Every structure is written in structure tokens, then in C-alpha cells.
């Protein structure tokens, strides 16, 4: 009788080693889904939707709704991410120091009435250069701003010089042209010297020769002097 008895060694189930082959990756099956039974307090469709193993619903959430968090992870609030109750990112939040409406500044063309143009022309015939107090006085009388009066006189003087040049170019005698230029320069210098003696400084600026109209750089958000 043979007493050499060896008990059979139980065979352990062989586990397939994890591999990165495409066949092994495709063989992995997703975890089974469990169905959530309807709650007595809710009859919505979302409550009967299948959930993943950790409780995330397979239902698309709104874009601006807060993202569901795992119970083990607390939601972190970051100023650049969407937060609960906000419809816009915190990056574009309103700053109290900034005005609600931003007024865009642009060049607005001023339209003068006939009475205003008549008053400006009459004053220009008498005096081509105005001091600051004279501009304020004329602007108040014509219901205009000081800037409008100043700009109109600037453009009007430039237009007057163009007219003189055109008249001088049409003349046939070169000596007459030179004589007219000298008279115009002497007249302007005399007016500037007279204003300087009275403590008034004439306006000095550079204008475009092609600009005959009046352009006022003003704030279009304020209804002041809109004609």
C-alpha cells in the first residue's frame, strides 16, 4: 500500500496582466450601471435616469449650472471659474469704480443756425482775433460754447487766407500779388501786436488747409450745445 499521498495543489485563477495592447484595452468592459428608483418626493425624469457607480447622472447638465462634485471632494471656489448662482465668469464682474456706460468720444460736426452764423460773421469783419473774455462774451450772446466760437474763428481765418491767395493768383501782375501779401501780413501783425499790448494772446494753432468746415472735439454723451 502506497502511503505517499500528496494532496492536489489548488489552482489559483490566473489573472490576465494588464497590457496596453488595443485588444486588451477593448476587452475591458465598463462597470454595470445601476438604476435609481423614483423617489416618493420627485417624479422627474432625471430621478429615473441610470447613474454611474459613484452617483453621477447620465443626463446633460446646463452649461451655467454648478458641476456636481463627488462626496469625497469639496467644491473649490475660484474667481475664474463658474460658481453657483452666477451667469457670467467672475473674470468679467462689474467693477464699482468704473462707470456703467462708457461714453465714446468722437469728432462731432456742429451745425450753426443762421442767426449764429450772422453774428459770427459780423464779429469777424470787425475783429479777427478774440481774447478769452471776448470769446466767452460772444459765446454767451450766441448760445454757443467757447470752444465752438474759438474753432469757428480758426477755420474762418483759414478760409479768409485761402480766398486771399486765390484772388492773388488770379491777378496778372506779379507786383500786385506781392503787394497784397505784404499788406495782409502787415495787417495780421498789427492785430497781434495790438492784442499783445492789451495783455491778450491770440490763438495759435495748426489747421489743415483742406478743412473749411467747423469740427468740434466734444463729448457726444453730454447734450450741451447740440444744435
Swiss-Prot record:
It holds the Pfam family Homeodomain. Residues 208-221 have a biased composition (Acidic residues). Coiled coil: none annotated. Residues 157-227 are annotated as: Disordered. Residues 166-195 have a biased composition (Basic and acidic residues). Residues 103-163 bind DNA. One of its GO terms (biological process) is regulation of transcription by RNA polymerase II. Keywords: Activator, DNA-binding, Homeobox, Nucleus, Transcription, Transcription regulation. GO terms for molecular function: DNA-binding transcription factor activity, RNA polymerase II-specific; RNA polymerase II cis-regulatory region sequence-specific DNA binding. SMART domains: HOX. One of its GO terms (cellular component) is nucleus. InterPro entries: HD, HD_metazoa, Homeobox_CS, Homeobox_TF, Homeodomain-like_sf. It is found in: Nucleus. Belongs to the distal-less homeobox family. DNA binding protein that function as transcriptional activator. May play a role in the determination and function of cell types in the brain. This is Brain-specific homeobox protein homolog. It comes from Danio rerio. The lineage of its organism: Eukaryota, Metazoa, Chordata, Craniata, Vertebrata. The gene is bsx.
Amino acid at each position: 500500500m502506497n502511503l505517499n499521498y500528496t494532496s492536489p495543489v489548488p489552482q489559483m485563477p490566473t489573472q490576465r496582466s494588464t497590457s496596453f495592447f488595443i485588444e486588451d484595452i477593448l476587452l475591458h468592459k465598463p462597470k454595470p450601471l445601476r438604476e435609481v428608483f423614483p423617489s416618493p418626493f420627485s417624479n422627474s425624469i432625471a430621478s429615473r435616469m441610470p447613474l454611474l457607480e459613484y452617483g453621477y447622472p447620465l443626463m446633460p447638465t446646463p452649461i451655467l449650472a454648478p458641476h456636481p462634485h463627488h462626496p469625497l471632494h469639496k467644491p473649490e471656489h475660484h474667481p475664474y471659474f463658474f460658481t453657483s448662482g452666477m451667469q457670467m465668469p467672475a473674470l468679467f464682474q462689474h467693477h464699482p469704480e468704473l462707470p456703467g456706460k462708457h461714453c465714446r468720444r468722437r469728432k462731432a460736426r456742429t451745425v450753426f443756425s443762421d442767426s449764429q452764423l450772422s453774428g459770427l460773421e459780423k464779429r469777424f469783419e470787425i475783429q479777427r482775433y478774440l481774447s478769452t473774455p471776448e470769446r466767452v462774451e460772444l459765446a454767451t450772446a450766441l448760445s454757443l460754447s467757447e470752444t465752438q466760437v474759438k474753432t469757428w474763428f480758426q477755420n474762418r481765418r483759414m478760409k479768409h487766407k485761402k480766398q486771399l491767395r486765390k484772388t492773388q493768383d488770379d491777378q496778372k501782375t506779379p507786383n500786385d500779388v506781392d503787394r497784397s501779401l505784404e499788406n495782409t501780413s502787415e495787417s495780421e501783425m498789427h492785430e497781434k501786436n495790438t492784442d499783445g499790448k492789451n495783455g491778450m494772446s491770440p490763438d495759435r494753432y495748426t489747421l489743415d488747409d483742406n478743412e473749411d468746415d467747423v469740427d468740434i472735439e466734444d463729448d457726444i454723451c453730454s447734450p450741451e450745445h447740440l444744435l
